[in-house]
């Protein structure tokens, strides 16, 4: 899953559970030096995060980057709004998605790629409770089937 030169730092596992993700985009983040050091240590929480489009630019909200211990006066607000860097064509595509009813921009994962902090941004529709239950039931049945197949394989040997 991890490509060459890519190190995963934070993954939002809840995103695929809460949203039906239709498309993903890779975005850079505008960060301060102490934030980068803190992210490299894995001190970032993207579970509650979301992105918004303001003046044809995309901003990341509600993502917590813990202050760097040795950063003292250079540390910024942990929950500050951060700008995301995408190509204009990608931003236009995202604007088109978000203008449709119910679409949300969700941070999927944060990773290092060739020394740069990148964010995988997912475009999705929120799932209803019954959709989540169906997905859980489907996963449980798949696990049961795999378990049965594994036991049969062991019995034949």
Curated annotation (Swiss-Prot):
Residue stretches of biased makeup (Basic and acidic residues): 132-157
Pfam families (alphabetical): SmpB
Positions of region (Disordered): 130-157
Primary site of residence: cytoplasm
Cellular component GO terms, alphabetical: cytosol
Compartments where located: Cytoplasm
GO molecular function: RNA binding
InterPro entries attached to this UniProt entry: SmpB, SsrA-bd_prot, SsrA-bd_prot_CS
UniProt keyword terms in alphabetical order: Cytoplasm, RNA-binding
Biological process (GO), any one: trans-translation
Cited SUPFAM superfamilies: Small protein B (SmpB) (SSF74982)
UniProt xrefs under Gene3D superfamilies: 2.40.280.10
Family statement drawn from the similarity comment of this UniProt entry: Belongs to the SmpB family.
Function statement: Required for rescue of stalled ribosomes mediated by trans-translation. Binds to transfer-messenger RNA (tmRNA), required for stable association of tmRNA with ribosomes. tmRNA and SmpB together mimic tRNA shape, replacing the anticodon stem-loop with SmpB. tmRNA is encoded by the ssrA gene; the 2 termini fold to resemble tRNA(Ala) and it encodes a 'tag peptide', a short internal open reading frame. During trans-translation Ala-aminoacylated tmRNA acts like a tRNA, entering the A-site of stalled ribosomes, displacing the stalled mRNA.
PANTHER family named in the record: SSRA-BINDING PROTEIN (PTHR30308:SF2), TMRNA-BINDING COMPONENT OF TRANS-TRANSLATION TAGGING COMPLEX (PTHR30308)
Name recorded for this polypeptide: SsrA-binding protein
The organism of origin for this protein: Alkaliphilus metalliredigens (strain QYMF)
